[in-house]
Amino acid sequence: MLSTMQDIPLSLTRILDYGSAVHGQTQVVTWHSARDGAEREETNFATISARAAAFAHALHDTLGVTGDERVGTFMWNCAEHLEVLFGTACKGAVFTPLNKQLMNDQIRHIINHAEIQVIVADPRLAEQLSKVLAGADSVRAVVFTGATKPPVLMPRGVEVYSYEELLDGRSTVYEWPTLDERTAAALCYSTGTTGAPKGVLYSHRALYLEGMQLRSSDSLCVTHGETFLCCIPIYHVLSWGVPFAAWMTGAPLVLPDADVSPATLAKVIADTSPRVAHGVPTIWIQLFVHYLKHPPERMTLTEIFAGGSPVPPL
C-alpha cells in the first residue's frame, strides 16, 4: 500500500524559489578587500535569485548550454558565485567549481575529465586560467565576472565574455524545468588525495537533504536572522552546503572573497556581526593570535565550525 502524502522532487529549484519569495530581503555581503573598488558589496536573496535566472537564460541562449553540460567556476566566495551555482544547477546543467589552489595540471585534468564547456572566472585569475586552458579542449567559453574583460589572451577557439554584459537585458524570470531529484546538480573534485583528483556527483535530492540537516541544532544550526560567515570555499564541498540551508531559513551570509587573512577577517567580523562561521583550522588559529595582539571591542561570533584537518590544541 502506498501513502497518500504529497510526493514532490527535492530540488535546488524549490530552495531557490522559496528563499527568494519568503526570505528575499535577507542580506548577502561580499567583502572585496583584495579587489579594487568598494570593500563591502551588499545584495539579497531575491536579487541573487533573479540574476541566477538571467544567467540561466545566458547559458541557454548565448553559451549553448541546453542539457546537463558541466559549467565550471574559477573564483572565490562571492555573490556571483551563488548566482552561477543556482542558475546552472536549477537549469539542469551541472555546477563544477574548480579549486585554484591545485596545481595547473590537476585543474586541467578536472576540466578534461568533467568535459567542462563553460567557465565563469574572476578576472584576477585570468593569467592562471589561460595557462590551465592550454590543452583543455572541451572549454569553448570563459565568462569573467565584472563589467569588463581582462587583457589576457585565452587559447584559440575560446570565446570570452563579460558577466555583467552577458546578463544585461536578460529576463530575470526563468521557467525552471521539473527535474528528477536524482539528477546531478554539482560535480566536485577531491583535493589532497593520492593520484589525480576524483569527482563526486551530488544530486539535487542530496543537496536538499543536506540543507535541511544543516538547520538542525545537532549540526551547524543555520538559523533565521543569524549571520553566517562562510570561510569554506564553494569549491570545497559547496561551502559545506551552507548556502542551501541559508536559503531555506533566511540566514544572512557573509562571503570573504579572496582575502581571509587575520586582519581582514577581524575587520569583516567587526563590520558584519556574524554569529556563526566555518573554515579550516589554520584560519581560526591565525585569527586567535591576531585577537591576542588586537583584542576586539566587541565579539558577536559565538560558534566556529572547523574541518578539513584536525584542530590542534591552542
Predicted regions and their residues:
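Conserved pre-ATP/AMP-binding loop-to-beta segment of ANL
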Residues: 24-27, 155-161, 168-189, 196, ...
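A short helix-loop-beta submotif of the ANL/AMP-binding
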Residues: 69-70, 76-96, 100-104, 112-118, ...
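Conserved AMP-binding A3 loop
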Residues: 41-47, 185-212
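Adenylate-forming
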Residues: 76, 121-131, 147-149, 232, ...
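Conserved AMP-binding/adenylation subdomain of ANL enzymes
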Residues: 208-227, 235-275, 290-292
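A short N-terminal helical cap/helix-turn-helix that marks the beginning
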Residues: 7-31, 50
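Structural core segment of the AMP-binding/adenylate-forming
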Residues: 14, 90-165, 273, 280
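Conserved AMP-binding/adenylate-forming core of the ANL superfamily
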Residues: 28-86, 103-108, 162-165
